[in-house]
Amino acid sequence: MTFRTLDTADLAGKRALVRVDFNVPVDGGKVADDTRLKAALPTIRFLADKGAKVVLLAHFDRPKGKVVPEMSLAFVAEPLAALLGAPVAFVGDCVGPAAAEVVNGLADGGVALLENVRFHAGEEKNDAEFAKALAANGDVYVNDAFSAAHRAHASTEGLAKLLPAYPGVSMQRELEALDAALGNPKKPVIGIVGGSKVSTKLDLLNNLVAKLDRLAIGGGMANTFLFAQGHDVGGSLCEKDLADTAREIMEKAKAAGCELLLPVDVVVAKKVAPGVETAVRSLSEVQADDLILDAGPESAKRLLAAMDQSLTLIWNGPLGVFEVPPFDEATVSAAKHAASLAKSGKIVAVAGGGDTVAALNHAGVSADFTFVSTAGGAFLEWMEGKTLPGVAALES
């Protein structure tokens, strides 16, 4: 894939319409986690420094094409301005005369945040007329919201057809990192896929076993594979109806030469709660009332050794119920090991997905990974090998 890059664009005095992801967690009407605001800063600063008028487009929540006052983006302007160290004008609509007046009145290098694009039904329908109304406030289009790139909406896809289109700084970093992890990786490549259910990650598993040298499966989804192999998983989370599917994935991996790493021992308890009594069991020792809540120490040791033999790691999903210690041990040990390998340049380590980001933050190692994607659904679809409309629309 080839893209125009912002450093080649003539930006002075131009209105740059920038699609960002400000769909942030909220607590008591305030931004509870400003990660996504911070992710937009490099692009905003780059454009402002080049003398562009920076016009931010974003969605928040699911107003379903109607104005829902409690889903207004107004609350984002103040924390964004504080992070930016510059004023941010908020506009109560994203199209029409009110938006045009503020945008056209911006000084070069000034920043405006327009109202929630999803207040208009045309956004999610990718309506051509709505895209034109958005485009009326811009001379160039910049997409810095990789996390919304799996949606063919007016502000993520339609706009890119109407104005010269560029990836933003964060978007470009994301595309380069994902290409290094899956598109054109240094081999051998190991994947870690965790989380609770196989059913939500079928496309992902089928795509990865065809591309990776090794794939470690953890979390609740590993129980489905263990059950498919004939092991008793006690009262653990397990999609028993997907046993045949799990066996098909195992066969596919074998045919493709992808080594599957499943737990060989597990950490169990009678309930999920902090400080409960736990035990490490081999697979043959799991009891009827056991809940498997983490991979065991031998499984973790094998995973670390497999990482040592790899040059690229791609990670989506935790290995256990990391939110409730001590069921975080396998996830934390794997995360710390991957981070130390990445920091010393021995491996390219790319991770993504909401639970994964939370797990790496919990382990305190996010900063040492080569790249951590906060994109969620878009990251998952990229890993599944799907075309992302918002990315495809930027191709030059």
Curated annotation (Swiss-Prot):
It is found in: Cytoplasm. InterPro entries: Phosphoglycerate_kinase (IPR001576), Phosphoglycerate_kinase_N (IPR015824), Phosphoglycerate_kinase_sf (IPR036043). Keywords: ATP-binding, Cytoplasm, Glycolysis, Kinase, Nucleotide-binding, Transferase. Substrate binds at D21, F22, N23, R36, H59, F60, D61, R62, R118, R151. Pathway: Carbohydrate degradation; glycolysis; pyruvate from D-glyceraldehyde 3-phosphate: step 2/5. The keyword rRNA-binding does not apply. The keyword Glycoprotein does not apply. ATP binds at K201, E323, G353, G354, D355, T356. GO terms for biological process: gluconeogenesis; glycolytic process. GO terms for cellular component: cytosol. It catalyses: (2R)-3-phosphoglycerate + ATP = (2R)-3-phospho-glyceroyl phosphate + ADP. GO terms for molecular function: ADP binding; ATP binding; phosphoglycerate kinase activity. It holds the Pfam family PGK. Monomer. Belongs to the phosphoglycerate kinase family. This is Phosphoglycerate kinase.
